[in-house]
Design a protein with these regions (language model features):
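Short amphipathic alpha-helical patches
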Residues: 58-62, 94-99, 158, 275-279
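Hot-dog-fold acyl-thioester-processing enzymes
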Residues: 1-87, 139, 150-269, 325-333, ...
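Generic recognition of flexible, low-complexity loop/linker segments
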Residues: 238, 274, 294-295
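Short, structured motif recognition centered on aromatic/hydrophobic residues
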Residues: 35, 89, 104-108, 124-128, ...
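HotDog/MaoC-like acyl-thioester-processing domains
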Residues: 1-15, 98-176, 280, 287-342
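A cross-kingdom feature marking solvent-exposed beta-strand/loop segments within repeated
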Residues: 85-96, 110-112, 265-278, 291
């Protein structure tokens, strides 16, 4: 019997199947330091223990996306090792902060299956949960992936497409216990604009750009213990190593500091598309659009629903062509909720 893991293929999944992913990961300030070295992340809540304590938290949490990448990375050997593409995200929620010293593990349940008409691939929907050492859920999200079949003669499963929310409402969002922006320091945060300064449909060009390097993107992907072959093996694609989509997400979020410095905590993920592939040598820029805004149930804490778009060129705020398809320079279209002082 083979002792190596070839990964799961489409025919290996079944509705209701639960996957317990190896290996647990204790996150420390080492991950924080590397995260801030790999991305120009500057949001104050994740940079300063004193700033975080002034906002009612016990210390500075691990960056929301760093925690997401750890949880996501655990799922790759079981879900996307044989994937053709990661197709989308929905119903993502950050339920409580992750602090240095927390140990994270991941588990997923298959909630949807649909074989493609070519008979060679199919789409798998999974709901993934990240849990800490106290078995508390810290992150949950749905994603769907196109996965290859190994046995092309395997019968197609019954098609089940989950009914997912098009977007989370403000009532679905969880404000971390103790979060209090009444003593928020706008000088130290780097920007004076509060929640009420942002208007629905407003667009923000984040101006700065970062060129992706081969060594950096592979270091980042290894940091999250993401084992997907396409990110490392030069022989898997004629164009070269594909940049992990999460690398683009984190880069764009970090660039958004210039214009959204007070959008401190990501608490919801409504939708996301990796519109076009990213490769080393591409220069990532970003822009945002305010889609919605709402007051949370916590006094002084507002929520902004933001579209974050990462590009590798083209005009700011350009997204789709006349045919409705993403323009070739668009890398990422992400829809998320963030908390901001009112």
């Amino acid at each position: 019997m083979a002792k190596t893991n070839p990964g799961n293929f489409f025919e290996d999944y079944s509705i209701g199947q639960v996957l317990h992913h190896a290996v647990p990961r204790t996150v420390t300030n080492g991950e924080r330091a590397l995260y801030h070295a790999l991305y120009p992340a500057r949001h104050a809540l994740y940079s300063s223990d004193e700033f975080a304590r002034n906002c009612g938290l016990p210390q500075s949490p691990i960056d929301d996306l760093a925690a997401f990448h750890v949880v996501f990375g655990k799922t790759v050997p079981d879900i996307s090792l044989n994937a053709v593409a990661n197709l989308g995200y929905a119903e993502g929620r950050w339920l409580q902060p992750v602090y240095p010293g927390d140990t994270l593990r991941s588990e997923s349940q298959v909630i949807g299956l649909k074989q493609n008409s070519n008979g060679k691939t199919g789409v798998v929907w999974v709901r993934t949960r990240g849990l800490n050492q106290r078995d508390e859920v810290v992150i949950e999200y749905v994603r769907w992936v196109m996965v290859r079949k190994s046995n092309l003669d395997a019968p197609a499963p019954e098609t089940v497409v989950p009914d997912l929310k098009p977007a989370l409402s403000v009532d679905d969002l969880v404000v971390p216990q103790g979060l209090d922006f009444s003593k928020y320091d706008f000088v130290q945060s780097g920007q004076s604009d509060r929640w009420d300064a942002y208007k629905t449909e407003e667009t923000i060009d984040h101006v700065d750009g970062v060129t992706v390097e081969e060594a950096e993107h592979m270091l980042a992907t290894r940091l999250w213990q993401n084992t997907a072959k396409v990110h490392f093996d030069l022989t898997t694609r004629p164009e070269g190593r594909l940049i992990y989509g999460g690398h683009v997400i984190s880069m764009a979020r970090a660039l958004s500091f210039n214009g959204l410095a007070n959008a401190q905590m990501i608490v919801g993920l409504n939708d996301g598309a990796h519109a076009n592939p990213c490769f080393a040598g591409d220069t990532i820029k970003a822009w945002s659009q305010v889609l919605d805004k709402a007051e949370t149930g916590v006094p002084g804490v507002g929520a902004l629903r933001l579209r974050l778009v990462a590009t590798k060129g083209g005009a700011p705020f350009a997204l789709r062509g006349d045919d409705g398809k993403y323009l070739p320079d668009v890398l990422l279209d992400l829809d998320y909720w963030a908390l901001m002082p009112i």
